[in-house]
Amino acid sequence: MVGKGKPLLHRRSTLKLSTNLVVDSLQDVANPAKVIEDLGFESLYISERKHDPFMQLAVAATATDRIKLGPEIALAFPRNPMVLAYSSWDLQQATNGRFVLGLGTQVKAHNERRFGLKWESPGPKLREYILAIRAIWDCFQNGSELNFHGEFFNFNLMTPMFNPGPLAVGPPPIFVGAVNPWNCRMSGEVADGFHCHGFHTARTLRENVINNIEDGLQESGRSRSDFTITAPVMAV
């Protein structure tokens, strides 16, 4: 049990803990976020359930100074990559570099029946989605020409009036939340981190998640030290 006001983790600890905040109202975000930060957690993630996670994260950003903040996960396909690129850029600036963009596909039923979207090649589409966001961010940060063309998305217009410009802290990292081996491998290729599903075993993490992520990292010329994996633990 953690005493009131006592940090959960020693500041020099190599173990990094994150937690997930679920609330019924936006008014319930600020105080818990501050308490979680004061307890020593490294990261606070907010799921996309009853409320827009980016609105909740904006509230959490105003109440905290150190803790990393991000959605775990935000649904990619209901949002255009350009729209999400702007939202993430603003949160990265508002948090002074503490924002982590977590993305996922959700399942077919939610995409088709809750959001009215066409369900098409979710894995490859998410991969292209991430590459599109990175191209947009490169335009924001480095002034490069926006000229992205893919199977699902095309972006080739960015004038100075609509370019927010570079951030001193740089673009935020992108994490993926997924289950199947293809998406795990894809995450290792194009993402910076991975959110494991809440229901897992040591075997599934090793064989289904980590092995495939490492294959993807090898494809991208990176090592395991370049990548972050978060694995939730349920206490009963």
Please provide the spans of the model-predicted regions.
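Conserved beta-strand positions in the central sheet of alpha/beta enzyme cores
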Residues: 45, 68, 100-102, 195
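N-terminal beta1-alpha1-beta2 module of alpha/beta enzyme domains
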Residues: 2-71, 77, 172
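Catalytic cores of alpha/beta
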Residues: 81-89
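Glycine-rich "substrate-gating" loop/helix at the edge of Rossmann-like oxidoreductase active sites
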Residues: 74-79, 118
